[in-house]
Amino acid sequence: MYYLAKEAIDLGHEANTLYLASYQTAGRGRFQRSFYSPQGGIYMTLHLKPNLPYDKLPSYTLLVAGAVYKAIKNLTLIDVDIKWVNDIYLNNHKIGGILTEAMTSVETGLVTDIIIGVGINFTINDFPQELKEKAASLFKTPAPITRNELIIETWRTFFETPAEELLYLYKKQSF
């Protein structure tokens, strides 16, 4: 998803665009680590154009983590945890991650584009041996909600909830 969003930016596509995938063949996390992303997950990247100095940017990773927590809680009453700085956990197992990248204009010094990638193990039934002890899925099939419902609620929450509340939720659920 990241590469698709980067390509769209290079082609001049509009901001506030959400890119979605059913699976990824080369998903990446922090430090370019591989992110297992088969069918049954939610893989999405949001492109924003803040046009702000770096020191004036909101803490996008923290805000999105707060929004993911609140969206899951609103729809399911499940309390997930947030492992500093960008991982979503359920019962001590990683179920998701958030990756944010900023692009800066050399001419203006402003951050022109932000790409926020979110991956959530929604209904993944089987993990590779090396992940079985660390990773889990939010739900077993059948899930009580749809992937679309969680996608919509996550971004509705991100855009409509005051930043102070999302940061509070982030801090409250962090470990």
Locations of regions flagged by a protein language model:
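N-terminal lobe of the biotin/lipoate ligase/transferase fold
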Residues: 1-78, 96
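Long, positively charged amphipathic alpha-helical accessory segments at protein N-termini or as interdomain linkers
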Residues: 10, 53, 59-79, 90-175
